[in-house]
Amino acid sequence: YDSFKIKVGRDVQSDEERIKAIRRRVGENVAIRVDVNQGWENSANTLKALNALESVGLDWLEQPVIADDIDAMVEIKGKTTVPVMIDEGICNARDMREIIQKRATDKVNIKLMKCGGIYPAVKLAAMAEMAGIECQIGSMVESSIGSAAGFHVAFSKKIIRSVELTGPLKFKMDIGDLKDCYKIPYIQLNHQPGLGIEVNEDKLYQLMTSSYCIE
């Protein structure tokens, strides 16, 4: 791997220590991407942490503050050279318009399950592309079906520079066969119609909690 994503956000000081320790362990040639999941809460905590982490050389910092505090993201972006990414702060086109108008971020993390599916995700990516904001297709630990949809969106726009669709790799049992397409650290989709996923109905029935037949 040439990059790592780290989840932090419980305590700023301990987060700083963990990130520095990881940098020491992996060396200087591996990209470190930090996802705070809103845990640093505000711009003051975030800027303090970024100052302490200046020597680490972060690839980007994801959603350090509360989701709806777009103004805090504006402040952070204006006071650091570390690229910042909005995740929880974007769910729909209205959010994207505000982000673009305020120039609040360098990157956005688009999640199909959060924004409403394939078409809304492509729409958000198109808006970001016009504003020069790079995109990532994010994961909510979905099955092969959801992950395949995300990969197809990712391949549709050049502005989508990264993906984190690893849900199928984390499941003991998955209803689809996308796992066969992972060629770590790459993904190689097939040429089958639709999403290219074959649903295993036996596994589907094993995982179902209830079913209804509509005639």
Where do the model's predicted regions map?
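Gly/Ser/Thr-rich beta-alpha loop segments that engage phosphate groups in nucleotides
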Residues: 11, 118-119, 140, 196-198
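Shared catalytic-loop signature of beta/alpha-barrel
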Residues: 51, 57, 68-85, 90-186
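C-terminal extensions of enzymes
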Residues: 169-170, 174-215
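Metal-dependent enolase-superfamily TIM-barrel catalytic cores that perform enediolate-based chemistry
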Residues: 1-80
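Short amphipathic alpha-helical leader/targeting segments
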Residues: 18, 142, 164, 199, ...
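A cross-domain feature marking catalytic cores of carbohydrate-active enzymes
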Residues: 6-8, 34-38, 62-65, 86-88, ...
